Amino acid sequence: MPETFVSLVGNLTDDPEVRFTPQGTQVGSFRLAVTPRVREGDTWKDGETSFFRVNVWRDLATHVGDSLSKGDRALVVGRLKARAWETPEGERRSVVEVEAEEVGPSLRWATATPQRANGNAKADTGTGAGSRKGGRR
């Protein structure tokens, strides 16, 4: 069955929750509120907000927990995953969640200083804002 990938940009509704499975694997989750902008005549208005539960695993869970918090604007790329279960009362429930491959802060209205997972800050290789020293384009 083909997988469905999505790219989302929205705001965290709460701080990410990071925990461990019984096997010791890090797992985290957060809710992302995504509100499209809709043009009505000469003005732009907020459209209907959609809420997505985003799951992150292993090191990504730790990095998200250390880097993002409630209200932060974030970008998420991941797979849609449908999950179904039955409650103790016998009711069938289902949910569609996003299993994230990539998560990062939005730089539209904020700045960030990337720091490698080993604790070393990303080296400044340029001579000023927007520099592309080294020929990478």
Per-segment meaning from a language model:
Residues 15, 35-39, 59, 83-85, ...:
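Short coil/turn motifs at secondary-structure junctions
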Residues 48-59:
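Beta-strand/loop nucleic-acid-binding surfaces
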